[in-house]
Amino acid sequence: MAKKKSILDLMKMKKAEEQVAWVTAYDFPTASFAEQAGMEMILVGDSLGMVVLGYQGTIPVTMEDCISHCQAVRRGAPNTWVIGDMPFGSYQVSDEDAVRNAVRFMKEADVDCIKLEGGDRVKSRIRAITDAGIPVMGHIGLTPQSSGQLGGFKAQGRRVDNARVLIQDALVVQEAGAFSLLVEAVPPEVTKFIADKLDIPVYSIGAGPCDGQLVISGDMLGKFQAFTPKFIKKYANVAEVETNAFKEYVAEVKAGQFPTDDHVYHILDTQEEFEKLFQEFK
């Protein structure tokens, strides 16, 4: 079993131009499969609101939701760097709130770090959490918790003025003490500049090549059917496999073809003894 990565390992990988591959996971089996496949990191994202809980966005997701799913992922991937995603409302109010909730992630869910969205507007939060001894990953570009302010789930940094803000935000996140940065739905030219400019690792989700790549597991596995982002490559169609399996099961149950003799437990005493037993209750 591979040794869990450390922040020092991730920094060394950036310097060596070695890519980091990671995915989201929200449950024990997916986390276990991801670890077996050699993923260096797993994000328990607030995207669980959409891909697991059926919400229209990430806003309704609670701390309890995130912690519960982080606990399941940690049990499934004990040797993988696990990132707890701070949900909407867990860090927006104050630095004290942010630290308190980040501590909950570390103590209750046994994550290795937390992630929060935003640049300049959350610099005091990042600083406060890191001052408390908790590693922080930043997140800029398309930030789902702020999608309403961004005009929906749209790519960011496609114009010079917006790209300038993203670059400034990236520098602020690093200066505030974050150990890494996730950039989402940003043109690769901008992402590359940020990755080259920053000393900390810069990871991409739909933002082109940099120090590593993140994808939503439900998207890459073809499980989430509401929509598929442009940047997703489907490596499987699990939804089709599961649906067909369910259909076959329904058909066999209706036709009396399941269960067969192979799928039942057989009695250990004689049939006659059981017949006597049944007679007692008639």
From Swiss-Prot:
InterPro entries, per database record: Pantoate_hydroxy_MeTrfase, Pyrv/PenolPyrv_kinase-like_dom, Pyrv_kinase-like_dom_sf
Compartment annotation: Cytoplasm
A Gene Ontology term for the protein's cellular component: cytoplasm
First-listed, main subcellular location of the protein, grouped into a coarse class: cytoplasm
Cofactors that this protein relies on: Mg(2+)
Catalytic activity, reaction form: 3-methyl-2-oxobutanoate + (6R)-5,10-methylene-5,6,7,8-tetrahydrofolate + H2O = 2-dehydropantoate + (6S)-5,6,7,8-tetrahydrofolate
Keywords: Cytoplasm, Magnesium, Metal-binding, Pantothenate biosynthesis, Transferase
Pathway: Cofactor biosynthesis; (R)-pantothenate biosynthesis; (R)-pantoate from 3-methyl-2-oxobutanoate: step 1/2
EC main group: transferase
Active site residues of this protein: E184
Residues at which Mg(2+) binds: D46, D85, E117
Gene Ontology molecular function, alphabetical: 3-methyl-2-oxobutanoate hydroxymethyltransferase activity; magnesium ion binding
Chain residues that bind 3-methyl-2-oxobutanoate: D46, S47, D85, K115
Signal peptide residues on this chain, from the entry's feature table: none
Pfam family, one: Pantoate_transf
Co-factor binding comment: Binds 1 Mg(2+) ion per subunit.
GO biological process: pantothenate biosynthetic process
EC number: 2.1.2.11
Subunit: Homodecamer; pentamer of dimers.
Family: Belongs to the PanB family.
Protein task: Catalyzes the reversible reaction in which hydroxymethyl group from 5,10-methylenetetrahydrofolate is transferred onto alpha-ketoisovalerate to form ketopantoate.
UniProt name for this protein: 3-methyl-2-oxobutanoate hydroxymethyltransferase
Source organism: Alkaliphilus metalliredigens (strain QYMF)
